A protein has these predicted regions:
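Eukaryote-biased recognition of intrinsically disordered, low-complexity regulatory segments
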Residues: 12-31
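Catalytic domains of cell-wall/extracellular-matrix polysaccharide-remodeling enzymes
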Residues: 192, 238-353, 357-373
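Short, contiguous acidic and Ser/Thr-rich linear segments
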Residues: 27-41
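Solvent-exposed coil/turn segments that connect beta secondary-structure elements
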Residues: 79, 102-104, 185, 211, ...
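Active-site beta->alpha N-cap acidic-glycine motif
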Residues: 150-239, 243, 247-251, 256-258
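Hydrophobic membrane-insertion alpha-helices, especially the h-region
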Residues: 2-15
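N-terminal pre-catalytic segment of deacetylase/amide-hydrolase enzymes
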Residues: 61-71, 76, 84-179, 188-191, ...
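LysM (lysin motif) carbohydrate-binding repeats in extracellular/periplasmic proteins that recognize
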Residues: 37-77
Length: 386
């Protein structure tokens, strides 16, 4: 009888210990909880104490699902529990809990590595244009959201370094200096111009058309043999901004090839027809062009205003470092031939030394020597914008 009573007492004690209620602090509020209560059940019965899951966000930062993010955060005795740990936890004496809102989550996404091409910045107002800073490509990671269909750039993108085109008017020291230049040849007028230059012991720069060089190779060779500078006016005098990339590069490089074949000189110097060489053209062909040479004094000799008018235009407008534009081809150039002695003699009377464009650039000293030497080369780590 006594043994039976003792057994009942022991069972009652075990039952009391195992199923008794204990105080459990939750978010600073003390609640009575039966020992062994599943934590997951306890949280659900109390609606997670007002805490809510985080939002599910798109890669672009828009809300896809207000409750589709990370679940409510549950911390026991300073340690955050995982979802599996919450499901496996039975509440016990001495536990302390904190329940808070879940954090936002980003939708599933795929990643794409993208190259960022450099842009072109072009200085204005100068007669000589050249690559002052080579561009370098950047890169970024693009996220493609699987639910939203949105795309967004990930953090940590490396920006591109822009290509910078310098543009300066030449200001040589020790002058005054001036460069005489001729476009659109060689032609039947070129020998007369060369003879005048030789007679007066001066050198000029000839911006030749590649197709004219191909059909007048002896005249092109005579330019170089006379100690003059030969450069390119492109192959066929097209408006370069209207050309697609491959056509543009061909228009430039074919002229270089024809000049080299006729004279042995591989130039990188051009004068774009109409002076039109924009950021777009530099971005497409800056690796094959050393410099684009414009002018400071336009004689308008192609309008045939008379030899004296052509000469007066030069003498009334020339300054130290000026580049003078004339033509030895592209039409009737008799007035240019007639004006040339007047120009040379007038410049000499005013103390000017007549040099080539390359010499003028070198005397100025601000443009890299590789430009003068037709040795410009794009660095291996550089990139063109297009």
């Amino acid at each position: 009888m006594l043994a039976g009573i003792l057994a009942v007492v022991v069972l009652a004690g075990v039952w009391f210990v195992a199923l008794r209620s204990v105080p459990v602090p939750v978010n600073g509020q003390e609640l009575s909880v039966r020992i062994g209560t599943p934590l997951e059940t306890f949280l659900a019965d109390n609606d997670y104490f007002g805490a809510t899951p985080g939002r599910l966000m798109s890669v672009g930062g828009n809300v896809i699902d207000e409750r589709g993010g990370n679940p409510c955060a549950v911390v026991r005795d300073g340690q955050e529990l995982t979802t599996d740990e919450i499901a496996a936890t039975a509440m016990g004496d001495g536990d302390t809990y904190t329940v808070s809102n879940g954090t936002d989550a980003v939708e599933p996404y795929t990643e794409e590595e993208v190259t960022i091409p450099p842009a072109v910045q072009k200085e204005r107002g100068g007669a000589v244009q050249y690559v002052k800073q080579w561009g370098q490509a950047g890169h970024k990671t693009v996220l493609h959201g699987e639910r939203s269909g949105e795309t967004a750039d990930a953090e940590g993108a490396v920006p591109a370094t822009d290509m910078i085109i310098g543009s300066i008017n030449l200001k040589p020291e020790g002058g005054p200096y001036v460069a005489l230049t001729f476009d659109d040849g060689p032609s039947r007028y070129t020998p007369d111009i060369l003879a005048i230059l030789a007679d007066r012991g001066v050198h000029a720069t000839f911006f030749c058309l590649g197709n004219q060089v191909a059909s007048n190779q002896s005249e092109a060779k005579a330019i170089v043999d006379g100690g003059h500078e030969i450069a390119s006016h492109t192959q066929s005098h097209q408006n370069l901004p209207t050309l697609e990339r491959d056509s543009l590069r061909s228009e430039i490089s074919t002229a270089f090839d024809n000049i080299e074949q006729a004279t042995g000189v591989r130039t990188q110097m051009i004068r774009a027809p109409y002076g039109a060489f924009t950021e777009q053209e530099w971005g497409r062909a800056g690796d094959i062009v050393g410099c684009n040479v414009l002018w400071n004094v336009d004689t308008h000799d192609w309008e045939r205003p008379g030899a004296q008018a052509i000469a007066d235009t030069v003498l009334n407008n020339v300054r130290n470092g000026s580049i003078v534009l004339m033509h030895d081809g592209g039409g009737n150039r008799e007035q240019t031939v007639e004006a040339l002695p007047l120009i040379i003699d007038g410049l000499h009377d005013r103390g000017y030394q007549i040099v080539t464009v390359g010499e003028l650039i070198e005397l100025d000293g601000r443009i890299p020597q590789a430009v003068v030497g037709n040795a410009v080369s794009m660095p291996e780590d550089a990139a063109l914008p297009a």
